[in-house]
Amino acid sequence: MHQLIRKFVFTESHCLEEEDNTKSFAELFEKLDVNKDGKVDVSELKTGLAAMGFSMGKGEAQKIVTSGDTDKDEGLDFEEFSKYLKEHEKKLRLTFKSLDKNEDGRVDAKEIQQSLKDLGINLSDKDAEKILHSIDVDGTMTLDWNEWREHFLFNPAEDLQQIIRYWKKSTVLDIGDSLTIPDEFTEEEKTTGMWWKQLAAGGVAGAVSRTGTAPLDRMKVFMQVHSSKTNKISLVNGFKQMIKEGGVASLWRGNGVNVIKIAPETAIKFMAYEQYKKLLSKDGGKVQSHERFMAGSLAGATAQTAIYPMEVMKTRLTLRKTGQYSGMFDCAKKILRKEGVKAFYKGYVPNILGIIPYAGIDLAVYETLKNTWLSHYAKDTANPGVLVLLGCGTISSTCGQLASYPLALIRTRMQAMASMEGSEQVSMSKLVKKIMQKEGFFGLYRGILPNFMKVIPAVSISYVVYEYMRSGLGISK
């Protein structure tokens, strides 16, 4: 892999002499400095390495130049270039040594697996072998120092934590539902405080995303509650009815409480997840995949239990008529006075039951898509790139929604029934029977169209805002 880079930078010796090292860097620098102005800029670095067969991810060339550019002239002169490579090489050697558990000078799949486990990331044997295969040059299924250095010399990742972030499942993609397994943070991220910055960035991204797709979310709830075989509501007619009743601004009814509940739910879920992992683990806090899934599901149930009254208010505010409630507190006051405390937990059972199929299918589909990508395309790099990660996350979340949607519909109808005049208060099982008898199986999927329509814009908005927030909060890639 990358034969020209090996020719310029690497020798057969594991310990390059300082003068040989400098000479190799000088030859590489001359090759990259196409316009011969004595410095290598982002464009030259990217183009030159691509010509040598070294593919770089988005923004990696810029990050290398920014890291090494001490005089801030938007380019690396030879001194800056060689200094960056030498310092980066030292960091890579430390990482390699931390991986090489038995100190035999080679890293195998088991050592990669163990190192990631030490950082709180569980990896299957198959996944570890695939990542190893993507770096292994000589086909021995072990890595020596030269192979490791060759693969990561022009990758701005400086330590194992950054390298493993390629495939860490992130919950930044907010598609409006909160049933996912919480995000996983390494020990370094927890001790440096990076975790709260990532949660804050994700929270802001979710708020903007939900606001941007609120009209479609209101349409989904509207169709879940009011649409039936005898009262078919199309997207166009539904929007016309809502605008006629309350104006364009009415399309955002219920969005305020939907955004406000992000902060407490995220905080409770994260704290509960950490505690459940400790309770379920048998070996000093290191949890297996099934334990992680259980901890995530329990954390989701805990968070939902704590903020569920806000879920009920969101549904009521979304469906309200003009003048019915003056705001969130007025809504809470009227529900409490007319229906009592129990009303704040209507639909709680189907909501909790929906966590298992949603989270389980979300994780299973994500892992399947990830393994498919690794087995077919991870020949030169284990880095999937932004589009692949977004695609995997979107598809897996959508599949999870599809599986749990009937329970979500039952929950919404139970939340709304008490506020609808003349509606009969029934249990979850009776409501399912009633829908099946009157509308058939597809009656459980009323409102699925606007729900799916909001997935792509929601994911896109989440990602763009999250990246801006990462930059603003100084979160490293």
Swiss-Prot record:
GO biological-process terms attached to the record: adenine nucleotide transport; ADP transport; ATP transport; cellular response to calcium ion; mitochondrial ATP transmembrane transport
Region (Regulatory N-terminal domain): 1-174
InterPro entries linked to this entry: EF-hand-dom_pair, EF_Hand_1_Ca_BS, EF_hand_dom, GDC-like, Mit_carrier, Mitochondrial_sb/sol_carrier, Mt_carrier_dom_sf
Sequence positions that bind Ca(2+) 4: 136, 138, 140, 142, 147
Domain named EF-hand: residues: 20-55, 87-122, 123-158
Mitochondrial intermembrane side: 1-198, 274-296, 367-389, 467-477
Binding residues for Ca(2+) 2: 69, 71, 73, 80
Region (Linker region): 160-169
Protein name per its UniProtKB record: Mitochondrial adenyl nucleotide antiporter SLC25A24
